[in-house]
């Protein structure tokens, strides 16, 4: 019934198995990949005919994790998987980015790649396996895919690279780098690092590239057994259209792309396009070519002119040379009620970034396959349509926004203080208010400033820069701080973030079939120069975290109580802790080890809550003086609440230093008094005294009398 084919290799000390022919046989390509005991299924289906009216590759990639893969049942009312999680979205992008540039340019058929995690062994993250499985499924499917690709994760610890570190090993590594590419070149890099230098980062990329070659060979071996016949793709010759178009549009396009202001340049390019379309499609005449073909050629001509200008003259669209960074303006404290805020402007790219500090109640609970965990640092990136002068629909967070937000998160995360030193939940929101290239790196710079403005003690300020590439044969130019047009019309988007000490995040996407180690080395070196320059500009606004938290930020005090007192502080059904929160207005969080965190933006509220909790969790000391409130008056004395919820008796003989006939002659309910703890009787009842304390000053009269008596004795002895 089944015609199965499989290959198996040892990879990084664990078996990797690729199998096809048993599951999902109606898909164009289907591969079950197993690494350790982590299993994923990758499927590829492509439409039989091209999609009409599109000038792009209609590729969709969806990665999904099933709760059953980890032996769990989903939470929530419906008990089934819902919309994609952040992890699923990020892995979908991770698969998409290296495979997209490898499709034949003319391919316009709807193509869908779906990767499903079927089993997770809690050791091997499914993301790398998902990339490998998708590559194998595409290679078998018959779609015009110029792969296969391989992928690997690289860690770095004890001055050594680690291939595909396990989840446990990842907790101790200085690097989390994912690299993908072909047998010849690197196509994609995604990473987070603890301020590593350029040589270590480049070494990690090349280490990963070398070590996924056996995976590529295994996919080729499987394809030789089971691949379908390649589909035919109609390659259309547009050279005649391009020749005509050059004659009527080249000079106008060169002039348009010499205009430095984005909106003016776009208007000029649109005018040239209108002229070209009018030439090729005159009114009342039968056109020689399809409109879509002419529009495609115009787009290609735009790219060629920009690229020729840069390679021939070394000058870019806005007049800069290849290394110059646009003008930068940094401002902090721009929003009066925010805990921390910054406005970062670089040329025509601008980000308004806001930091908010919260407590343990604000931590995000993330339900992952490996288990539920809490996240205390959140970074959200928003890209509204007005940032590029367009209208658009506002709705749910888009994949791009999630991806850019995570990139900035990775850049900032390594320089945050440990949670035990700074016990806040921190949320950073970046509102991209203008965009002309590199808005994610503007988010990194703005986030660093906003965090320092809020008083978050970062290890060092962090900045980011986006690099581009123009590659024609053996000629190339690496561009610092790319514009949006240079991103769209160039061959590479290479983003580097870090501090003066090293790189914290590196992301690379290649639109051609890979770049060489030499080009990456040049790009990393040039990026460091740009990053140091940007950090210098940022230092004009703020050089380090403010000494104090923002005026409206909550303050958090942390202390410990005995674990056997936790129940008393919480109370039956949470009654006591609710009362503390309601009456003081402070937030209280108690952990299982007795750690108590009290948070409030009101200092008095915090003091009151701390005092209340400590009074419950500790015992009063004999001989100490306490403030108290008379809660009940009896014939034999008064009961006084003096230590949290603890009451004690002031016997009638201890009310005053004279004979008292009636308790009410001295006190009544509600009176504020000062009492001294005398001790406890045989039944454990608390004995208090008012007469031992000066009710005005709170001075201990018994101690005063003893001191005076002790001071007189030597004088008497001397007199004798």
Swiss-Prot record:
InterPro entries: ExoRNase_PH_dom1, ExoRNase_PH_dom2, ExoRNase_PH_dom2_sf, KH_dom, KH_dom_type_1, KH_dom_type_1_sf, NA-bd_OB-fold, PNPase. Disulfide bonds: none annotated. One of its GO terms (molecular function) is magnesium ion binding. Mg(2+) binds at residues 487, 493. Belongs to the polyribonucleotide nucleotidyltransferase family. It catalyses: RNA(n+1) + phosphate = RNA(n) + a ribonucleoside 5'-diphosphate. GO terms for biological process: mRNA catabolic process; RNA processing. Involved in mRNA degradation. Catalyzes the phosphorolysis of single-stranded polyribonucleotides processively in the 3'- to 5'-direction. Its cofactor is Mg(2+). Its main location: cytoplasm. Residues 554-613 form the KH domain. The lineage of its organism: Bacteria, Pseudomonadati, Pseudomonadota, Alphaproteobacteria, Hyphomicrobiales. The gene is pnp. GO terms for cellular component: cytosol. This is Polyribonucleotide nucleotidyltransferase.
